[in-house]
Design a protein with these regions (language model features):
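C-terminal edge and immediately downstream basic/flexible tail or linker adjoining helix-turn-helix-like DNA-binding
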Residues: 9, 91, 147-148, 164-191
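Sigma70-family region 2
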Residues: 11-12, 48-66, 85-87
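A short, charge-rich alpha-helical start-of-domain segment used by transcription regulators
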Residues: 7-31
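Amphipathic, Lys/Arg- and hydrophobic-enriched alpha-helical face
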Residues: 22-40, 57, 121, 173
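Structural recognition of an alpha-helix C-terminal capping motif at a helix-to-coil junction
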Residues: 31, 45-52, 65-77
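Helix-turn-helix DNA-binding module
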Residues: 119-130, 138-155, 169
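Acidic, proline/glycine-rich intrinsically disordered inter-domain spacer in sigma factors
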Residues: 97-122
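Arg/Lys-rich amphipathic alpha helix in sigma70-family domain 2
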Residues: 59-63, 73-93, 110
Length: 191
């Protein structure tokens, strides 16, 4: 089924088209949810909620960009909204904002296996993990992140810097990374 046929069918609430859309995009979108979630079950819940929104908002897609990108934005916003409902997420952002932490200069480790990086990202505190995902992986600006998370732009920047440093430390500790402070792009591996 072509993407156009899927879109047309989904607009008519045809179950076959909805199933095709879900089967085509759910694996990639589950990976997005998994980067934000605490566990696989939470990621699957976010995915289901996100696709419900995709189907209910199908009439708003205007063919001005990639359909997959439109779905991804809905899924990311669904993940963020779920995290914002989570008290631990808000407390994490408040604690980090209140306690300034000195971090080393920006450093970028060498390219490692994407799966290993994703697993290490999941170890990060939820506030760090969320900002890192949004900025480095999803490509949002710090201004957009500050709007999404209701935080200051400077908080987004500091969360991102601290997340990168903490992630580098985790990668070194797990012996996934052996040379700290290499100037190569390693987050590209998880996009």
């Amino acid at each position: 089924m072509t993407e156009e046929a899927i879109l047309h069918g989904c607009l008519k609430n045809e179950a076959a088209a909805q199933r095709e859309l879900y089967n085509r995009y759910s694996p990639k979108m589950l990976a997005v949810c998994y980067r934000f979630a605490h566990n696989r079950e939470d990621a699957e819940d976010m995915l289901q909620e996100g696709f419900i929104k995709v189907f209910s908002q199908m009439h708003t897609f205007q063919n001005k960009g990639a359909f997959e990108g439109w779905i991804r934005r809905i899924i990311v916003h669904t993940c963020i909204n779920n995290l914002k409902k989570n008290k631990r997420f808000n407390e994490s952002l408040d604690i980090v904002h209140a306690h300034g932490v000195q971090v080393r200069e920006e450093s970028v480790p060498s390219i490692v296996q994407a799966k290993q990086v994703v697993e290490c990202i999941r170890i990060l505190p939820i506030g760090y993990r969320t900002v890192l995902n949004l900025y480095a992986i999803e490509g949002y600006s710090h201004r957009e992140i500050s709007d999404m998370l209701d935080i200051e732009e400077s908080t987004s920047r500091s969360q991102y810097t601290r997340a990168k440093q903490m992630l580098e430390d985790i990668l070194i500790k797990k012996k996934i990374l052996t040379k700290p402070r290499e100037k190569t792009e390693w987050l590209v591996a998880v996009r």
